[in-house]
């Protein structure tokens, strides 16, 4: 640090201390609405190493699971005025057109669809594009989410880190499958797909079965440079 910069830094520290002594709040004392420990992104890094580090346990019973346990579908957890489904469509489709409200996505193009590698034209109401949870809600329920708060389950169901626009028929063939039981037909997307699942499970501290971890290893061993995606929403949704 140069002498001039060192002087400026010391002056700034002195000013902050002076403000505190006079009863004023320093800048560091002001609340930062954009900052939250829960909002910290899942750290990037090797997806394969992260998969190795996931907790391994058996699948718990599905008893008590229903979609409503994860809140109403597609709520506005980030408080931007739009539901999560439309946020994801707007982010992942090209040539998007919206309703007059500025939120509802009426049409767009998914090119390529990650699950099939094909080009799909989206028109609202035609049901050719679904928003898929990379880690299915029922899978999460059986691997830790039963114990979560309602707010954490709502956050999980609406976290962009766990959501992808995809061909509807292919998505529905997946059901509640994990890596051991289902992979997208588009082999070029499998590394990214599995890395996404690993990142979500790491972020939300969900466990995996032994077969699931083995399948993750097998896919990611073919792309050892694959990194974890990061980001998404806080792990607790706002109180509605």
Where are these regions (language model features)?
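Bacterial N-terminal signal peptides that target proteins for export
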Residues: 1-11
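Hydrophobic helical h-region of N-terminal Sec-dependent signal peptides
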Residues: 12-17
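C-terminal motif of bacterial Sec signal peptides marking the signal peptidase cleavage site
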Residues: 20-23
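Bacterial signal peptide processing site
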Residues: 25-28
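N-terminal low-complexity, Pro/Thr/Ser-rich intrinsically disordered segments
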Residues: 32-69
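Acidic, divalent-cation-chelating loop motifs in proteins
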Residues: 74-78
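Acidic, glycine-anchored loop motifs typical of Ca2+
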Residues: 79-83
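Domain-level detector of nuclease and nuclease-like folds
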Residues: 114-240
């Amino acid at each position: 640090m140069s002498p001039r910069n060192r002087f400026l830094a010391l002056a700034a520290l002195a000013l902050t201390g002076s403000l505190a002594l006079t009863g004023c709040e320093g800048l560091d004392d002001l609340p930062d609405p954009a900052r939250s420990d829960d909002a910290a992104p899942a750290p990037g890094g090797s997806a394969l190493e992260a998969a190795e580090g996931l907790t391994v346990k058996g699948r718990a019973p599905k008893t008590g699971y229903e979609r409503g346990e994860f809140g109403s579908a597609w709520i506005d957890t980030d408080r931007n005025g739009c539901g999560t489904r439309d946020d994801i469509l707007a982010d992942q489709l090209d040539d998007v057109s919206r309703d007059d409200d500025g939120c509802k996505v009426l049409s767009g193009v998914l090119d390529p669809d990650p699950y099939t590698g094909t080009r799909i034209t989206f028109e609202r109401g035609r049901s050719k594009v679904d928003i898929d949870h990379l880690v299915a809600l029922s899978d999460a329920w059986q691997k830790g989410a039963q114990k979560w708060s309602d707010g954490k389950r709502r956050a999980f169901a609406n976290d962009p880190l766990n959501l992808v626009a995809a061909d509807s028929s292919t998505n529905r063939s997946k059901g509640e499958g994990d890596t051991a039981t289902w992979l997208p037909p588009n082999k070029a997307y499998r590394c990214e797909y599995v890395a996404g699942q690993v990142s979500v499970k790491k972020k939300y501290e969900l466990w995996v079965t032994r077969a699931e971890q083995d399948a993750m290893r097998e896919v990611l061993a073919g792309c050892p440079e694959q990194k974890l995606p990061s980001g998404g929403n806080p792990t607790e949704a706002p109180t509605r």
